[in-house]
Amino acid sequence: MKIPSSNSAVLFHKLSTPDMRFYAFAAFLVIVFLTGGGSRDDIQSLIILRPLAILFCAYAITVKAADQWKGRMFPLYIAWSLAALMAIQLIPLPPSIWSAMAGREIFAEIADMAQIEQPWRPVTLSPSKTLNSLFSLSVPIAAMMLYLNLEEGRRRQAIVVFISLALVSLVWAAFQLSGSLRSPLYLYQITNNGSPVGLFANRNHQAVMLVIAIVMLGWYAASDEPEAKFTKAKLYGGIAMIFVILPLIFVTGSRAGLLLMAPALVAAIILIYFRRYLARKRPAMEKGEMAKSWLSSQKVFIFSMIVATVALATMAVYFSRSLALDRLVGSSEV
């Protein structure tokens, strides 16, 4: 039965509303966290994730808000260029051209010795791996396109969605620490058993995600004006979550996470200071000694953040749960 055009227009309008575009982004982010926790090409959940990513790409293009994309296309251009490069490598070439390319001599010699006629071959020596890499780009491309369709206010909420999912992975990792090495809480067959990998298959993925969450929490903690509602709750809640994340990065055993943690923490402190405190410095100075005292208390607070962070890191190392530090200095074989 043919759907009337008026009904199609109504459906398109509903699917293209700002709220629906945000829900689509949030849903896709949840799907990625639940099914895209590994980089291996034999993970079964990729059968679900990648086709859905392509569908979300189609949705993002269909409801594209041109004014939202303007001036923000550079990351997409990079991703599309990579996809084009991979697609070119899959184009079959005639034997004469393929055999003349660098690194193909041994294949041509084997074919001559076996008296096998050379077929048309793609540029890549591993078509399956190249095809896997090509389809893997569907996930970041879909995420970028869905994010570009969001309005400014919704983009702020999108960061909150990411932080929430990061905290879910953190809590999941904490439960993994309390279980056995073969606990069913590990979602992937090939994983870092014994490490708090959360919703991921690899300790590095979990640690880097937590590092990103630190920066986002720094932004979130100071994202509102000081007079806004619940601004203090967001500030202290965001900082408290940073303190919760820091020891777990040590425990993951990820050298990448350990090395990136310090600059991420510095970035979070800078975001909090410049977005929340420094912006009020000039009017505060005009208010007299009380404002100066207020500013001084905030400086003490930031200094306390640094001291508390160092203390937490020291405790993690002291109690011998810092596998990341052991691996970094070469005292661990894992």
Where do the language-model regions lie?
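Short, hydrophobic transmembrane alpha-helix segments
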Residues: 34-47, 62-69
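Transmembrane alpha-helix boundary signature
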Residues: 61-71, 87-103, 114-123, 181
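Charged, glycine/proline-rich intrinsically disordered loops and linkers
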Residues: 101-123, 281-295
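Membrane-interface helix-loop-helix modules in multi-pass membrane proteins
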Residues: 70-76, 82
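Alpha-helical transmembrane segments of multi-pass inner-membrane proteins
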Residues: 2-36, 50-60, 83, 90, ...
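Extracytoplasmic catalytic/substrate-binding loops of multi-pass membrane glycan-assembly enzymes
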Residues: 333-334
